[in-house]
Amino acid sequence: MARAGPRLVLSEEAVRAKSGLGPHRDLAELQSLSIPGTYQEKITHLGHSLMSLTGLKSLDLSRNSLVSLEGIQYLTALESLNLYYNCISSLAEVFRLHALTELVDVDFRLNPVVKVEPDYRLFVVHLLPKLQQLDDRPVRASERKASRLHFASEDSLDSKESVPASLKEGRPHHPRAKCTEALAKQSLVMDADDEAVLNLIAECEWDLGRPPGSTSFSQKGREADSRGSQESRHLLSPQLVQYQCGDSGKQGRETRRSSCRGCCLEKMPWSQLCGELPPLYGAEPEASRAPRPHTYFTPHPDSMDTEDSASSQKLDLSGEMVPGPLPAPGKCRKRRMPVGRFQTFSDQEGLGCPERTHGSSVPKESLSRQDSSESRNGRTLSQPEASETEEQRSRGVTDTREPSPGSHSALPGKKTALQAALLETLLDLVDRSWGGCRSLHSNEAFLAQARHILSSVEEFTAAQDSSAMVGEDVGSLALESKSLQSRLAEQQQQHAREMSEVTAELHHTHKELDDLRQHLDKSLEENSRLKSLLLSMKKEVKSADTAATLNLQIAGLQTSVKRLCGEIVELKQHLEHYDKIQELTQMLQESHSSLVSTNEHLLQELSQVRAQHRAEVEQMHWSYQELKKTMALFPHSSASHGGCQAC
C-alpha cells in the first residue's frame, strides 16, 4: 500500500495549476480534474480545496496517500472517482461518499479498506444507488440485492437494539405491560427451592394433609409454603400476570404489591375451622365425597395494598355468586394471593361447618379467591355442594376483615361504615332467604337482592377507582407540567442567550458592512481620479507626438518613391526582354516555313520512290511466277537423271 508521508493538504491554487484554469475563471466550470501522485508529492488530505468544484464530473486522485476523504462531499455532480493506490483504511471514510449520489464509477483498489473490511464491496454498492462499476468490475444485480438484504437486516437489528432515548422518554408506559416485562425477565426454570416443594408433595403422596413420615407436618408445611411463596413469581402464567398487573391507573400500587409477594403463607389446619360435614340430601356419590387437597391462605393477603389504595378499597365478592360473565381482570386482581400460587381445599371439608367458618380468622377475600380459583380450574360441583359453597361464600364475605395495624390507620371512616352496612345487609339477606334445604342458586328473590347489592358495590368501587385514577393522572400531569415548565424556562434562557449572541453578531456584521461601504466609496473616488489622470495623459501624448508623426509620414513617402523608381527600372528591362523575344519569334516563324516547304518536296520524292519500288516488286513477282511454271514442266527428266547417276 502507498505510505502516508508528511501531511500535504490539497489547495485551490494547486487545483488551478493542475487544471490550467486562469486566476479569474470560475472553478465551477471545470468538469474533469486529474491530480495523480508523484514520488515527490503525495496528497494526504483534501481540505476545502474542492468546495468550488460544484460542476466536476470526473476526479482522478490515484497514487496519492489520502487517509481521509473529508471535503469530497462538495462534489455533488461527480460521476467518476479514481482513488486507486491510496491509504483509505476504514468504512467511515468511505461513508463520506454518501452525498455523491451521481457516482457511477469508483475505484478503491490497493487501499487498505479493501483488504481489511470483508463487507466493503456490499457496503459501497448499498451506499451508492447509481453505481455501475466498482474497482474496475461491473456491479451485478445479485450484488445489489445481497447488499440490500444484508444491510436491511442489520438496520432492523440496530433499530431494535438501540431505541433513541427521546422515544423511550416520550412513549407512555402501560403499567400492565411494565409488570409483564418485569416478570418475563425473571427465570422460569425450577431451582432448588422448587424441587424441594415438589419433593415434599411427592413424599406426602400428593396429599399435603398427611405428614410425610416422621417429620413434623406443620414445620415442613410452613417451609414448603414459604419457599413456594418466594418462588411463585417465577411460575406465573401470562394470564395470571395480566390479572395481577391490574389497570393502568394502579401502577404504583402494583409495583409495591410485587415487592411484598415474598410473604410466607400461613398454614391453617382445617380441623380448627370446621368439623365433619353433615350429610345433606341423603347419601352422596363417592366421587363427590372424595377427599381433595387442602388450600392454605394468608391471614391478610391485601393488607400490603391498603396504604396506597385506601381510596380504592373494595369488597371482593366472587363472581360465582350470581350467574353472569367473569369480572374484568382489574377486578379479579384482589381475589388472588399476592404470590400467585393456589392450592385446593377438599370439597367436603371446605363445605362443612359454616358456623365455625363465620367466626374463623380466615379472611373473606381468601374464601373468595378459593371459589374463583375453583371456578377457573373448571371444577363442577353437585347441587348440594353448590348450595353449601354458596352459604360458605356468603358467610365468608360477611366476615369482618382484620387488617394489619399499619393499614388499619389508613382506612377512612366512611369506607369502614359502608363495609359494615354492606356486610350487615348481606347477613340479613342470607338469614331471610336461606333455610338450609335448597340451593340459593334457584332462589330468585335472593339473587335479585344480591345482584342489587353487588351492583351498588361495583358502582362505588368503580367510582373510587376512577377517582383514584383521576387523582394519579392529575398528579402525573402536574409533575409533567412542572418538568415542561422547567424545560421551557431552560429553553427560554437558552433562546435568550442565543438571541444575545445573534444580536451581537448582527451588530458586528453591520459594523463590518459600514467599514466595507466606506472602503468602497474610497475605492470609487480613487478610480474616478485615476480615470481623469489617464485622459489628461492621453491628451498630452497626442499633442507631443504630432511632429514625430509627420516626419514618419515623409520618410514613409520617400521610401515608397524609391520603391516605385526601382519598379520602373525593372519594367524597362522587362520591355527590352520582350522585344528580343519578339525578334526571335519572327526568326522561328521563317525557319518553320522553310522547313514546311522542304518537307513537302521530300514527300513528293518519297511518293515517286514508292511508285517505282512497287513496279519493281510487281516485276519480280511476275518473274518468280514464270520461273515456277518453267520448273514445273521438267520434273520427270530431272528425276530419271538423278537415278542414273545413282547407278
UniProtKB/Swiss-Prot annotation:
Parts forming coiled coils: 476-620
Annotated GO CC locations: centriolar satellite; centrosome; ciliary basal body; cytosol
Gene: CEP72
Pfam families, per the entry: LRR_9
Domain of life: Eukaryota
Biological process according to GO: centriole replication; gamma-tubulin complex localization; regulation of protein localization to centrosome; spindle organization
Keywords: Coiled coil, Cytoplasm, Cytoskeleton, Leucine-rich repeat, Phosphoprotein, Repeat
Gene Ontology MF terms: identical protein binding
Native source species: Homo sapiens
Stated name of the protein: Centrosomal protein of 72 kDa
Subcellular location field: Cytoplasm, Cytoskeleton, Microtubule organizing center, Centrosome; Cytoplasm, Cytoskeleton, Microtubule organizing center, Centrosome, Centriolar satellite
Biased composition (Basic and acidic residues): 152-161, 220-234, 366-377, 390-402
